[in-house]
């Protein structure tokens, strides 16, 4: 039976509409994942302390909230990224920023010298909020980078944000930098009088951050930090066939070695664990050959695994048999930024983090997943 011209036209039109719909869905899906990740993360983990102040709850229990400088840094970073899409306003950013500014750390023998570094933890004790002294470098780095991004997203506030960025990056170099090891320390408490002065957190190796801070300040020390810390990370990666690096390492001017268990916080201080899992994310956007080589070694190890699990010894033995978004999200972000490098299979295998709702009782998993969505789904 011959079809009429109208029937052919209608069939063709339906086919075109169907194909166009599939294309739109495919194009819009990453955008939808980004928007939903941010919305769920914001609603679950942001707590407003007052009309002008908010913090990221890291405790996974809204009844017993805990703020960390790490979490506040991530919160500012994510909010600035959301602002690029119009999902966050400068007011949202400023509420998180005001909380940071209210909890700046003091240094000196009697903690009498104010800084722009953030005190590392706040929580409720006997019905009152208390803030623990000392800073944590990872939080300060993300706060500074978020300020830089915010200046571009909200131009009317740019001078204010840039001024704060300059103060903060200056204080990072003043109080969280060891010139003898060419590295950032883990916090302002690790002074030259401390046995931890030579301790390096591998996830603080942030070459693109350091490039940005140098371009903003023209302070040559940021180049020294970048070169020193990338050298140390490459040294650590080359010590094992896996290319994996530990959470923490002891460093000198020209050497690095993993720490022993319980040196800092846990039995896994010298393994690829809860801190080092962020390293792929921190190297993802760097074109420096040392960063690329270290990242490639690590990623090829992961690409050979049937499932990437939550942590490994540096020799490649699994620490756990379950998967974790804290480990998979940074890997997804790294592979999404570095396609055709010999580990593309990780793009599909680690995408599972977006196949289920954002965790509502795991701040770390949820936050790293949100960062991976915002930066890796473009």
What are these regions (language model features)?
Residues 1-16:
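N-terminal Sec-pathway targeting helices
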Residues 8, 17-70, 81, 87-130, ...:
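Low-complexity, Ser/Thr/Pro/Gly-enriched N-terminal "stalk/linker" regions
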Residues 66-70, 109, 115, 137, ...:
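Extended ligand-binding clefts on enzyme/binding-domain cores
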Residues 41, 82, 93-103, 107, ...:
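Alpha-helical solenoid scaffolds that mediate protein-protein interactions
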Residues 76-84, 142-153, 208-215, 281-285, ...:
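Short glycine/serine- and small hydrophobic-enriched flexible loop segments
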Residues 83-92, 131-139, 153-159:
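Alpha-helix boundary/capping segments in eukaryotic regulatory proteins
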Residues 21-25, 276, 282-285, 334-337, ...:
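Terminal, non-catalytic domain-edge segments
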Residues 65-75, 130-151:
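Aromatic-rich carbohydrate-recognition surfaces in CAZymes
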């Amino acid at each position: 039976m011959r079809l009429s011209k109208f029937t052919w036209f209608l069939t063709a039109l339906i086919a075109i509409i169907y194909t166009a719909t599939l294309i739109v869905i495919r194009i819009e899906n990453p955008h939808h994942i980004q928007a939903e990740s941010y919305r769920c993360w914001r609603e679950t983990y942001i707590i407003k302390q007052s009309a002008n102040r908010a913090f990221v709850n890291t405790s996974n229990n809204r009844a017993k909230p805990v703020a960390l400088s790490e979490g506040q840094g991530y919160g500012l970073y994510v909010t600035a990224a959301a602002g690029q899409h119009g999902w966050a306003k400068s007011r949202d950013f400023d509420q998180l920023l005001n909380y940071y500014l209210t909890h700046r750390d003091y240094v000196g023998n009697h903690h009498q010298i104010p800084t722009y570094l953030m005190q590392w933890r706040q929580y409720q004790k006997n019905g009152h909020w208390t803030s623990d002294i000392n800073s944590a470098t990872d939080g300060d780095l993300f706060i500074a980078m978020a300020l830089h991004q915010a200046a571009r997203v909200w131009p009317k506030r740019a001078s204010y944000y840039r001024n704060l960025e300059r103060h903060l990056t200056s204080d990072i170099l003043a109080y969280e930098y060891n010139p003898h090891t060419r590295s950032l320390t883990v916090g302002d408490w690790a002074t030259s009088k401390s046995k931890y002065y030579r301790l390096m957190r591998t996830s603080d190796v942030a070459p693109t951050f350091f490039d940005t801070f140098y371009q903003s300040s023209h302070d040559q020390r940021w180049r020294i930090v970048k070169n020193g810390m990338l050298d140390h990370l490459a040294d650590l990666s080359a010590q094992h066939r896996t290319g994996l690096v530990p959470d923490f390492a002891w460093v000198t001017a020209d050497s690095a070695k993993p720490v022993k268990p319980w040196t800092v916080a846990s039995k896994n201080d010298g393994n690829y664990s809860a801190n080092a899992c962020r390293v792929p994310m921190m190297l993802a956007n760097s074109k420096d050959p040392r960063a690329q080589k270290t990242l490639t070694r690590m990623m090829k190890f992961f690409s050979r695994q049937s499932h990437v699990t939550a942590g490994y010894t540096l020799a490649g033995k699994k620490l756990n048999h379950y998967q974790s978004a804290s480990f998979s999200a940074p890997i997804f972000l790294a592979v999404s930024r570095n396609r055709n490098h010999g580990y593309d299979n990780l793009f599909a295998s680690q995408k599972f983090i977006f196949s289920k709702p954002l965790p509502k009782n795991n701040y770390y998993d949820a936050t790293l997943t949100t960062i991976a969505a915002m930066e890796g789904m473009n």
